[in-house]
Amino acid sequence: SKNDNYGANIRATLNILPIKGLKWENFVSYDKEQYETREYYTHYYPSLIGTNGQAYIQNYQENDTQYESTLNYSNIFGKHSIQALLGYTYQYTYSTSASMTNSGFDFDDNQTHNIGTGTNLTEGKASMSSNKEDNTYIGFFGRFMYNYDDKYLLSASLRRDGSSRFGDNNKWGWFPAVSVGWRINKE
């Protein structure tokens, strides 16, 4: 088996000076994974006796790209504390795979390097498969948090997410949330 993984992440933050407490953050990520598996079982492999050797090859590759951007605001005015967030996120994943299995080799010498010479291929018994998949996810989100005197708390958030994995008639969805809190021990 052979595995290769590559990845890179970049994060940048920009404090917007004219407005105290406002900052813009960005995150970019790329990840690539690929592997190849080659297996050969000789004529004498105990559970495969009579197959005249069996060869198996599988290749897989996946690329994943992500981007997220947020605008954050945080400030305190006397006993009032406010935090607000607006953001966007994007993710795209693309993968491919292929595999093949064949048996019935005259010799064990070539192993997986001449997989087409096995007799199961000419007899229609060899196994081959391939697959391609790509998925996209996009989200827009916002959150507002209010705190008065560290006693009374309010939080509200709203997301609008779209995904290629959602149902055909529901590619986008709204996801709201609200919470209220009271720290009774602060009274």
Residue ranges and their predicted role:
Residues 1, 38-55, 96-127:
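Surface-exposed loop/turn segments flanking beta-strands in extracellular/periplasmic regions
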Residues 95, 186-187:
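A generic secondary-structure boundary signal that marks alpha-helix termini
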Residues 90-94:
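Glycine-rich, aromatic-flanked loop segments that form ligand/cofactor-binding clefts
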Residues 4-77, 81, 135-186:
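Surface-exposed extracellular loop regions of Gram-negative outer-membrane beta-barrel proteins
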Residues 131:
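Structured, solvent-exposed acidic/aromatic patches
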